[in-house]
Amino acid sequence: MASPCDPLGCDEFFRGGFARRKASSYRSRGLDRTAARMLAFLRERGIAGASVLEIGGGVGEIQLELLRAGAARAVNLELSPAYEAEAAGLVREAGFEGRVTRRLQDIAVDGDGVEPADVVVLHRVVCCYPDYERLLAAAAEHARGLLVFSYPSHSVLARMVLGAENLSFRMRRLRFRVFAHPPDRMLSVLREHGLRPTVVHRGMAWQVAGAER
């Protein structure tokens, strides 16, 4: 049974309409470019028969592509319940019932019952979480082989954009915030937990880092 968790405002921001748009976009266009780069990193290193843990996977599109590419099973941990109906629909359409488990749980606060996995994925998740060190440490501890995550650029322009977004959230009285955490420090957290990180892609908006044990 999933443990109770503080959604950190994610339940206010990521609601049913957002989930429906994400699922519709995936059905019509597939993975976004950043997610596709993450998938390529994992496929190049081999995922046949692998177990997958995705933290904050939303409607689960990356998990589905990993299963299509040969992964055995996937677990998704989420803070917002709004994704569940759309995610279940995508799983049914893909024919992967019984191979995907979804839970409402904050692994950084409570990792009880979360088994280590061969592959750990965090797509646009660390930017929504204030304590990146705790989150990435928990993710790394659960990665038996590979970990890949995406995060916003740390450029001045990117930080200004995120600052403007946070101002709008405050004006709308939303608890949700976004963060541009320092990339070097995030990679150091992975090293401290036995992973060898490498930057896979540096984009103007989004960057991707992968790591191996």
Where would I find each of the regions flagged by the language model?
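Conserved class I S-adenosyl-L-methionine
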Residues: 1-45
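Class I SAM-dependent methyltransferase SAM/SAH-binding core
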Residues: 61, 65-99, 104
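A short, conserved alpha-helix within the catalytic core of class I
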Residues: 129-139
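Conserved beta-strand signature within the Rossmann-like core of class I S-adenosyl-L-methionine
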Residues: 144-153
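Conserved Class I S-adenosyl-L-methionine
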Residues: 162-178
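Short alpha-helix
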Residues: 176-194
